[in-house]
């Protein structure tokens, strides 16, 4: 968590250097920087990004190019570009959507992708016109295993820790030295090939998860668990001394198998002095009502909640401001670490709870509150598809969030944690203002009946005058028990072994 005060002088110097280092030439993504050499047109963004793992099985493939696709290519796109399974080589049936007059393309699978499987894009011999085929062929990713159900849909083999970021980075970040090891702002996010038994999960002197410094002292931290995901968030910035992460005694929920003891030693990189920039989220839609995402073509800062129960018209619109901490850029020339501190809050508009999208349920969600549970970590990196100075830089962010609703009954149905939410986007400077356009997919549980899917088209803009930027809001409401299950009404229906669930505001 962030507890270091940042002076205005530090902010101005560090932010200016960071923008100069990573965002030089990014006046937009129009490719309008002239030079005497011919730069081939290329893919400049993909979600999932190359080598991304733990991709939700409901995720679309979002592409953006340095120039618009030719009409001939668009008319024949279903035969020129396919999404293919690595496992059997079969082509995935998708619906194609052209975005921003051909600058972008979205591929929406007609059914859920298989869990824990690898996929890639294939360009046929006809190609994509002026767009470099090899840049598109770099898009390869692996879907997340299931969070419930048969063990084979979660992952294969014995109970295994798949990764512990940032100790283990995805292939896109692994070769970048500035991103290949933890820093003093790091939160540790672990994913496993089986769901973790909550009764075996604890942090502390005798806990199954421990983080100790060079003196052997336990580092104060918070631990969050959801299915196959485990997050360890240090309460304070880590000191640049040797630390050891130990996991011992953790068990798989389905089989009871114990994880082999895990030990990793590292020295965090110091990121001071940092810049802190306040980014506006919620006022953008009101200021520019017709503004849509350049990546998805959807309205910005809305989270559609699409499911069989709710239909495909429900959404919550986000509002609020976020503070982003940026590491001292001269020390990180190839990947600048960034952080959104835990406790940051975004507000969401009420969600329409209509059965099958048509029949009113009588439930009123009220305002939806989304709280950043742990420090969200990420990087600003050079564009992985092109080294042209005219293309925008990549922004990557991993976050954990808690969602609650103001209404009592809906809160019991919708209140939940969403761990390991992976955000990918583009960072540009427009008229001297840092702008982030990003994409992510969340899969919240709906009414305890099914998992919904929400494609987040995120847009954030830094306030031009950071001296007068508003302070991001925190959730300062006193903690209250809002509902519980089985509750007073349904106790006669409770069975031995049923959990007691407490839902707070």
Give a label for each model feature.
Residues 87-96, 214-222:
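Surface-exposed loop/edge segments in extracytoplasmic proteins
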Residues 200, 256-260, 267-486, 490-494, ...:
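Extracytosolic secretory-pathway proteins
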């Amino acid at each position: 968590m962030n507890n270091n005060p940042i002076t205005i002088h530090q902010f101005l110097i560090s932010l200016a250097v960071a923008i100069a280092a990573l965002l030089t030439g990014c006046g937009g993504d129009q490719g309008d920087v002239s030079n005497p050499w011919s730069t081939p047109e290329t893919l400049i963004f993909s979600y999932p990004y190359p080598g991304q793992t733990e991709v939700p099985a409901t995720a679309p493939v979002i592409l953006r190019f340095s120039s618009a696709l030719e009409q001939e290519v668009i008319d024949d796109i279903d035969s020129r570009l396919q999404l293919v399974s690595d496992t059997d080589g079969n082509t995935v049936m998708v619906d194609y959507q052209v975005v921003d007059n051909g600058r972008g393309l979205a591929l929406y699978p007609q059914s859920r992708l298989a869990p824990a499987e690898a996929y890639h894009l294939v360009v046929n011999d006809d190609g994509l016109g002026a767009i470099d085929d090899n840049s598109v062929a770099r898009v390869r990713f692996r879907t997340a295993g299931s969070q419930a159900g048969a063990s084979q849909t979660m992952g294969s083999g014995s109970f295994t820790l798949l990764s512990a970021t940032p100790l283990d980075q995805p292939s896109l970040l692994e070769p970048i030295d500035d991103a290949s090891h933890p820093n003093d702002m790091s939160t540790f996010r672990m994913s496993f090939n089986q769901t973790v038994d909550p009764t075996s999960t604890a942090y502390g002197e005798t806990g199954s998860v421990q983080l100790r410094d060079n003196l052997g002292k336990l580092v104060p931290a918070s631990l969050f668990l959801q299915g196959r995901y485990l997050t360890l968030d240090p309460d304070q910035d880590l000191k640049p001394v040797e630390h050891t992460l130990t996991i011992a005694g953790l068990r798989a929920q389905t089989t009871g198998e114990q994880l082999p003891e895990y030990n990793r030693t590292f020295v965090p990189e110091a990121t001071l002095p940092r810049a802190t920039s306040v980014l506006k989220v919620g006022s953008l839609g009101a200021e520019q009502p017709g503004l849509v995402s350049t990546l998805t073509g959807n309205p910005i800062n809305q989270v559609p909640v699409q499911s069989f129960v709710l239909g495909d018209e429900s959404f919550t619109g986000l509002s609020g401001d976020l503070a982003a901490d940026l590491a001292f850029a001269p020390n990180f020339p190839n990947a600048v670490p960034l952080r959104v501190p835990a406790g940051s809050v975004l507000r969401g508009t009420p969600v329409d709870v209509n059965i099958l999208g048509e029949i009113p349920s009588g439930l009123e969600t009220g305002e939806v509150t989304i709280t950043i549970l742990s420090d969200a970590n990420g990087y600003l990196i050079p564009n992985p598809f092109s080294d042209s100075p005219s293309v925008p830089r990549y922004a990557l962010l991993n976050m954990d969030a808690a969602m609650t609703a103001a209404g009592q009954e809906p809160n019991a149905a919708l209140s939940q944690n969403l761990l390991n939410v992976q955000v990918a986007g583009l960072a540009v400077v427009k008229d001297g203002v840092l702008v982030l356009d990003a994409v992510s997919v969340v899969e919240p549980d709906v009414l305890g009946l099914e998992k919904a899917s929400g494609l987040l088209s995120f847009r954030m803009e830094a306030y031009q005058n950071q001296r007068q930027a508003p302070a991001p809001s925190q959730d300062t409401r006193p903690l209250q028990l809002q509902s519980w299950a089985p509750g007073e009404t349904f106790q006669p229906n409770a069975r031995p072994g049923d959990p007691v669930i407490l839902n707070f505001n």
